[in-house]
Amino acid sequence: MLKPIGNRVIIEKKEQEQTTKSGIVLTDSAKEKSNEGVIVAVGTGRLLNDGTRVTPEVKEGDRVVFQQYAGTEVKRDNETYLVLNEEDILAVIE
């Protein structure tokens, strides 16, 4: 498993639907890039100049929405994860 460093989080992306409501199958080029996912790991938090650490606002298991082109995709054990900074998370889905 990947362990994020600092203020980074690891997200398992939620894939977009492969077919439309009317039953049309979408090709990879027609699908929009997903910007939702579930947090699978959280770093220790951002380190400030005075040496204190800011506790992350998100936790493992949170469903989140993040900026469209944020982060770096990493493939591990046949799974694709997204490593991004906590600041790139826009909202937690309740």
Swiss-Prot record:
SUPFAM superfamilies: GroES-like. It comes from the Bacteria. GO terms for molecular function: ATP binding; metal ion binding; protein folding chaperone; protein-folding chaperone binding; unfolded protein binding. One of its GO terms (cellular component) is cytoplasm. Induction: By heat shock. Gene3D superfamilies: GroES chaperonin. Signal peptide: none annotated. InterPro entries: Chaperonin_GroES, Chaperonin_GroES_sf, Chaprnonin_Cpn10_CS, GroES-like_sf. GO terms for biological process: chaperone cofactor-dependent protein refolding. It is found in: Cytoplasm. Keywords: Chaperone, Cytoplasm, Stress response. Heptamer of 7 subunits arranged in a ring. Interacts with the chaperonin GroEL. Together with the chaperonin GroEL, plays an essential role in assisting protein folding. The GroEL-GroES system forms a nano-cage that allows encapsulation of the non-native substrate proteins and provides a physical environment optimized to promote and accelerate protein folding. GroES binds to the apical surface of the GroEL ring, thereby capping the opening of the GroEL channel. Belongs to the GroES chaperonin family. This is Co-chaperonin GroES. It comes from Staphylococcus aureus. The gene is groES.
